[in-house]
Amino acid sequence: MQVLPPSSTGGPSRLFIMRPVATTLLMVAILLAGIIGYRALPVSALPEVDYPTIQVVTLYPGASPDVMTSAVTAPLERQFGQMSGLKQMSSQSSGGASVITLQFQLTLPLDVAEQEVQAAINAATNLLPSDLPNPPVYSKVNPADPPIMTLAVTSTAMPMTQVEDMVETRVAQKISQISGVGLVTLSGGQRPAVRVKLNAQAIAALGLTSETVRTAITGANVNSAKGSLDGPSRAVTLSANDQMQSAEEYRQLIIAYQNGAPIRLGDVATVEQGAENSWLGAWANKEQAIVMNVQRQPGANIISTADSIRQMLPQLTESLPKSVKVTVLSDRTTNIRASVDDTQFELMMAITLVVMIIYLFLRNIPATIIPGVAVPLSLIGTFAVMVFLDFSINNLTLMALTIATGFVVDDAIVVIENISRYIEKGEKPLAAALKGAGEIGFTIISLTFSLIAVLIPLLFMGDIVGRLFREFAITLAVAILISAVVSLTLTPMMCARMLSQESLRKQNRFSRASEKMFDRIIAAYGRGLAKVLNHPWLTLSVALSTLLLSVLLWVFIPKGFFPVQDNGIIQGTLQAPQSSSFANMAQRQRQVADVILQDPAVQSLTSFVGVDGTNPSLNSARLQINLKPLDERDDRVQKVIARLQTAVDKVPGVDLFLQPTQDLTIDTQVSRTQYQFTLQATSLDALSTWVPQLMEKLQQLPQISDVSSDWQDKGLVAYVNVDRDSASRLGISMADVDNALYNAFGQRLISTIYTQANQYRVVLEHNTENTPGLAALDTIRLTSSDGGVVPLSSIAKIEQRFAPLSINHLDQFPVTTISFNVPDNYSLGDAVQAIMDTEKTLNLPVDITTQFQGSTLAFQSALGSTVWLIVAAVVAMYIVLGILYESFIHPITILSTLPTAGVGALLALMIAGSELDVIAIIGIILLIGIVKKNAIMMIDFALAAEREQGMSPRDAIYQACLLRFRPILMTTLAALLGALPLMLSTGVGAELRRPLGIGMVGGLIVSQVLTLFTTPVIYLLFDRLALWTKSRFARHEEEA
């Protein structure tokens, strides 16, 4: 029977050691809560950190970019600019479309922003054109965020107009109602309509004008209230044949009489069922299609949203004819799930490696089982807290748990090793557990709170980067805290029941061999340490040199923002000469599609041509290239992009810009490349002067590639210069001229056909097949005040000019965005510095302002706060350690280990060819928390030896180093092996995880080697400094 030690021993662990059943049930409760939490947690690629973003689209067919800007965009911008919480407002006004993107502060709820946007639209309504076909429509979506799912709808038997009509009413509307869906767009422009193509010669011969025809059509097709009759006994509702539903009915419409004979619409026009906009088209691979892009609301969970769509699709497609085929071309969640699965596998691998290293050191199965239980229990218990905090299972939280594997095992190792030491000395297991746990309790608390202190600054990081890493930091802190609880409760209790002298002394051939090996290593370390302690100043110079080297490496290492991920989807923009027509652009697009589809890595392709709010001009096309799964192709996305661009370069007259889709989207505009730089001015003339000059210089920089600008001011314009005096004599107003031009060439929506399920438009235009180009203007006729017909050419001259194809604003002022990529041999930091240096050489006037946008702006912000972040982490840890040790000196000794970690991490990143990005910086901050553990374990035991055994400082620190060498080596290797799977990651999303693993493994290796020698030396030097300071104070007091 064991003799129990006094109740004063055991510290906070005593209660749990003495009550094994209660302790076991408590741990089972933590385990069950964690399992339930894991099943309840949503899955996503990254924490939901989107800015509240709303897009407002206004379509005004036929309007020029200048008209769209002044008549539509500007009135809306003035109202939006008064909203509180607005962070940034950008707009793009192109031919027939105005798109305004509103980005709000992170703290503003999206629903509140939505209410403000609706109120602003209502306030601007009276200022918008009266003939606007539809009011502005807003969507809770970020246009730069790639669609979560892309579907292609094709048919071999039905025209695209019928296909779109069915898809819009039976599929798109239902998907739009799913929670989390922000916007469903149908690209392809095949919305059904009745098209009226006037024969200009025919109406001129009859003395009619297009305005006469328009008035007749609008008056013949109405759908308004007619009232009802309420008699003594019955009520009767009035109805009439005031609606015309088909093209045949419109052909028979009488628009005028001549000599008593009716003139029907079919006599002067071709009337047919067609598409509302004939200058829009979409293709899936090589087949014309209706392409359905589904975008999520900012903040919505992408996995649950996509799952809901997948569940609904079968029942939606069942209602479609068999000839209509719906194909899912891309689903971003496929790669997100694969990335999360790979990270979970790496987490399991880290746990396995950590348990193996524990067995290697302890050489005892019962002793290995104890941390083998503590590690998964700590990690699983974290899931319960994550649910409470509304977190998700994503790459960052799983990375935090993977790194935590090496952290949480440290506490268990320290406890087991200390208890085992007493058992080997002959203590009974229960007494050894009480004594060892009580002795090590303060060390565990010190390790835990000093490590959590490192994570505190991450919680105060600003803007979107801070939001991004908040889940990472809190998840890691929770795992560390639960680990400390488990190590002070379950671990000593299990040691008291599972360890014994017999089990610890029981050895096999492997354990004997490993024991001898560790003894030789410790002996060699002891000899080396003795020599180092005899040459303290040389060792101190080494420590100082690591500090200097870390600063130099920090200055010269390439810096980036966020790793470029391979998500298997490439977004592309195809650019042609500015005067390109829709037919010309469609032909070029098909040529490029043929080239792209020949690449062995490409699985499918969707493309779109036309102006509809997502594409700014007719001379550009949007492409989405879906790659095969990563395990089915030989190259990663960057190599595929380079290969595709080389292949497309052979297609004449086009430029192709490609960029891989990313899980983290900070931009608010669809850009041609990954990074953006803007020039903003008070006028378009200023931009037209300086943009070409800057572009010329930027295109010569080797630090950037694929440089392009959205400044397109060479669009062909036929300027109708009306002689106002001549027009006035004939009684013709400028409104008459505009109406005649709009009727002829604006695809004017002049009437609406109402049905029970949908509404369709009647489109008026001139038939220009026989009079292409500017010659079509000669066919325009106007009605004079005396009823005569006057040709436009008699009162106006046609001048050919150039004008912008689109006009862009940023916060209500004209802006141009310059897009660029960064070549493989340069970093984003190099590119940013080169652009800033180039800008300075131009001496831009004061009314021109420049700014980086999107991820480049976030990079500048993150880079500027990084040094302060690290300083804050060090200060926080110093404060915690100072409070715990009640000393100003000992925390400095502990923190002296930090430069070695920085040197190792930065060297590893440079050797691996990785940039110092935000992921790597987080790794360095975590290293600050890890490497100081070595010093804490040494100093704790040295102080105890001085205080309790009366040892000299040199003997105390020497014995502490030898005594704690094995647990120090175990904990460091455990942390290293926890990060190793991340460093060696090769699967989906590996780009995101690898920098963290590389930095941590490199930092741990270098710091392990150096701190075992530098820490004891610095401990002794500070001890001497303290003694010298005390003697000086004592001397001054005696003299006084």
From Swiss-Prot:
Record GO terms (molecular function): xenobiotic transmembrane transporter activity
The annotated topology with respect to the bilayer is:
Multi-pass membrane protein
Give UniProt keywords alphabetically: Cell inner membrane, Cell membrane, Membrane, Transmembrane, Transmembrane helix, Transport
Which Gene3D superfamilies has this protein been placed in?
Answer: Multidrug efflux transporter AcrB pore domain (3.30.70.1440), Multidrug efflux transporter AcrB pore domain like (3.30.70.1320), Multidrug efflux transporter AcrB TolC docking domain, DN and DC subdomains (3.30.2090.10), Multidrug efflux transporter AcrB transmembrane domain (1.20.1640.10)
Which portions of this protein are annotated as coiled-coil regions? Answer: none
* Induction text: The mdtABC operon is transcriptionally activated by BaeR.
**Compartment(s):** Cell inner membrane
InterPro entries reported for this sequence? AcrB_DN_DC_subdom (IPR027463), Acrflvin-R (IPR001036), Multidrug-R_MdtB (IPR022831)
**Protein purpose:** The MdtABC tripartite complex confers resistance against novobiocin and deoxycholate.
Name under which the protein is recorded: Multidrug resistance protein MdtB
Question: Native species of this protein?
Answer: Escherichia coli O157:H7 (strain EC4115 / EHEC)
- Name of encoding gene: mdtB
